[in-house]
Amino acid sequence: MSTLEVKVWRGRADGAYRDYRVPRHDAQTVLDVVTHIQRRIDPTLAYRFACRVGMCGSCAMTVNGKPRWTCRTHVAKVARGDRLEIGPLANLPVVRDLVTDMSIFFDKSMRAKGRFEPTATRTDDFARVQPASAARRAADAAIECIGCGVCYAACEVVAWNPDYLGPAALNRAWTLVNDVRDGARRERLSAVAGDAGCHACHTHETCTERCPKKLSPTAAIAGLKRETVWAALRGEL
Amino acid sequence: MSARGETRLWIAQRTSAMVLAICVAVHLATMTIAVHGGLSAADILGRTRGSATWAAFYGIFVLAVSIHAPLGLRTVASEWCGWRGAGPDAACAMIAVALLALGLLAVAAVTL
């Protein structure tokens, strides 16, 4: 059995990487490695996970320089030889070790009006949305976000402009802009326009490249750019 | 700046970029043809002086540059230097005026 040489970030933002040696196994995930360190080597290691099957979005970390969901990332796919470097997500404050404070990430989703605003009441009939309609298909394309923060950590524009809403918040806004039942389209387009919103995106597509759910926040942001332009030309912003 | 204002600036930058894509291509083709055709400076001026077409073309070119370049510099100032707000906006507006004035003077010099 070979051994993995693992560097793991310890401490807060002014911390440093510490070396660990972890037995290597077949089909071993990066989360398995972190869990081994915490349970067998150093119980003070702080990290976050929940479902372990790629549903909850809790376990994202920086692995060999790139943000990834660690529960669905096999060591064999990302290790350089027998070496791994595991750190907290970028663009977020480090609480301790591999745990980041994701408050700003979720706050930005609210700033982008990422909450559904119903137009119907419980006494109304169900809304009938045709599955093949263009709006429904556009909403479908963006709807499976698990809020892992990988796109946010990968985004260069977030690093340059901390006010930028980021790919996940804009992706969520695009889902709701295409939701025909929603009643806050105009407010939402105003919330996502501007130099902290969709118009700041440089279309590097790093978010799309890194998204573990294979979504395209870049396409969602392009959609928001189009809709905000039409809204501006109609005087609705 | 308001969402409406920022969106309008974005529209201005993207629209000016489309204009520049055409203008730069035409300009480069014109320069290449002029150089390979062996035209002297006097020959070129003979064709441009009094030409409303060349005056309009390069006038539009200058206008697009004076819109596009300051907006790009504004973004660079914001993202790379952290300069945001009224100061950089005013500086970029002055750059726009300067580019427009210098460009139109150059157009006037070869077309009037």
Language model segments and positions:
Chain B
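Membrane-embedded alpha-helical bundles that constitute the cytochrome b-like, heme-associated redox core
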Residues: 1-112
